[in-house]
């Protein structure tokens, strides 16, 4: 119960827009009216600075910065941590695993632990640089790649043996492994912020076009997603996905990626910390046809996770020429508005369970 109450306080806002809280108004007090009007005129619920979006060459849309990632997660559960299951908690988990917090390791002071980690990190870097020079020299001499790999395995084994010797001499496990040396910051008390929050293309569009949250260019996002000259079927597919995403977000659902369960979206009533997703959404065109095996396969995967399969048929209400004209004119929100969503729930009928 305490965990749920703490989560309710943390995840108050379902979207990255915080409503303005106006002061109480006392009708018979003129100063109260003046203060209320002043607060109403001067207040704003817009972010002081938009969150920058990075568009990678591989088509990934990421947000960096711990505060920005936490803000998007706590205000609507947007994105997924690249090194986490959902919420970007890799940095906190790694700090806890390496015992880099202020409490430190039992029996050691924080300053001593920091100095020891810095010393081991520098030693590892020197060893690695020496081996890189040795490997380059072997390649220049024409040594086979298999022999170079064998030398590398031997070097790693020697490095591990030194760590074991250190553990045996001190009676305490080494605070830094070779694979952790590069992620520890120079101060030795934190790790490098290498985790990013990855957004779906429809999430990036929603936070750019529908909500003024991301500092991004919508044409750049679409060009990276569809290519410089997309065909009409590609445009329609993206429009259907965005229309479905916007439709469920506007109705208060928390929409997450459904790739884990072989569908397009997952629908949560509040979000992952509170309940499991109840519905899995598959976005389809009205004229899209599949055989029974396809529907049965999707339903079996979704049903195995105790979820209900929703077939969202997104229909275009205007001619294709009108959609193409709006798209080339970069009037994207008007193009998305040409689509409407119709849902159909797919359930397996079992004689033993559905008999009434």
From Swiss-Prot:
Disulfide bonds: none annotated. GO terms for biological process: tRNA processing; tRNA-type intron splice site recognition and cleavage. It catalyses: pretRNA = a 3'-half-tRNA molecule with a 5'-OH end + a 5'-half-tRNA molecule with a 2',3'-cyclic phosphate end + an intron with a 2',3'-cyclic phosphate and a 5'-hydroxyl terminus. One of its GO terms (cellular component) is cytoplasm. The active site is at residues 268, 276, 307. InterPro entries: tRNA_endonuc-like_dom_sf, tRNA_intron_Endo_cat-like_sf, tRNA_intron_Endonuc_cat-like, tRNA_splic, tRNA_splic_SEN2. Its EC number is 4.6.1.16. Keywords: Lyase, tRNA processing. The keyword Transmembrane helix does not apply. The keyword tRNA processing applies. One of its GO terms (molecular function) is nucleic acid binding. It holds the Pfam family tRNA_int_endo. Constitutes one of the two catalytic subunit of the tRNA-splicing endonuclease complex, a complex responsible for identification and cleavage of the splice sites in pre-tRNA. It cleaves pre-tRNA at the 5'- and 3'-splice sites to release the intron. The products are an intron and two tRNA half-molecules bearing 2',3'-cyclic phosphate and 5'-OH termini. There are no conserved sequences at the splice sites, but the intron is invariably located at the same site in the gene, placing the splice sites an invariant distance from the constant structural features of the tRNA body. Belongs to the tRNA-intron endonuclease family. Heterotetramer composed of SEN2, SEN15, SEN34 and SEN54. Interacts directly with SEN54. This is tRNA-splicing endonuclease subunit SEN2. It comes from Eremothecium gossypii (strain ATCC 10895 / CBS 109.51 / FGSC 9923 / NRRL Y-1056) (Yeast). The lineage of its organism: Eukaryota, Fungi, Dikarya, Ascomycota, Saccharomycotina.
């Amino acid at each position: 119960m305490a965990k749920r109450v703490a989560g309710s306080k943390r995840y108050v806002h379902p979207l990255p827009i915080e409503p303005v809280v106006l002061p109480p108004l006392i009708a018979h007090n003129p100063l109260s009216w003046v203060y209320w009007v002043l607060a109403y005129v001067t207040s704003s619920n817009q972010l002081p600075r938009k969150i920058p979006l990075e568009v990678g060459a591989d088509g990934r849309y990421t947000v960096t910065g711990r505060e920005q990632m936490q803000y998007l997660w706590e205000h609507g559960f947007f994105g997924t941590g690249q090194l986490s299951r959902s919420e970007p908690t890799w940095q906190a988990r790694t700090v806890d695993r390496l015992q880099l917090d202020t409490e430190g390791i039992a029996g050691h002071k924080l300053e001593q632990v920091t100095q020891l980690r810095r010393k081991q990190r520098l030693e590892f870097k020197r060893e690695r640089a020496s081996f890189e020079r040795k490997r380059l020299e072997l390649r220049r001499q024409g040594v086979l790649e298999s022999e170079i790999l064998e030398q590398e395995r031997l070097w790693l084994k020697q490095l591990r043996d030194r760590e074991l010797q250190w553990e045996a001499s001190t009676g305490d496990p080494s605070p830094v492994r070779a694979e952790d040396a590069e992620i520890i910051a120079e101060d030795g008390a934190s790790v490098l912020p290498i985790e990013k929050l990855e957004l779906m293309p429809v999430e990036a569009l929603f936070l750019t076009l529908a909500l003024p949250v991301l500092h991004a260019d919508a044409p750049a996002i679409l060009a990276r997603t569809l290519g410089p000259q997309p065909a009409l079927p590609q445009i329609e597919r993206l429009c259907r996905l965005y229309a479905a995403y916007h439709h469920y977000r506007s109705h208060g659902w928390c929409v997450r990626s459904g790739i884990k369960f072989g569908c397009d979206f997952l629908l949560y009533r509040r979000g992952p910390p509170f309940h499991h997703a109840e519905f899995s959404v598959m976005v389809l065109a009205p004229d899209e046809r599949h055989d029974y095996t396809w529907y049965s396969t999707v339903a079996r995967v979704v049903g195995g996770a105790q979820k209900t399969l929703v077939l969202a048929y997104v229909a275009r209400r205007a001619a294709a020429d009108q959609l193409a004209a709006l798209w080339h004119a970069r009037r994207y929100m008007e193009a998305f508005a040409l689509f409407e969503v119709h849902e159909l729930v797919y359930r397996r009928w079992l004689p033993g369970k559905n008999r009434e």
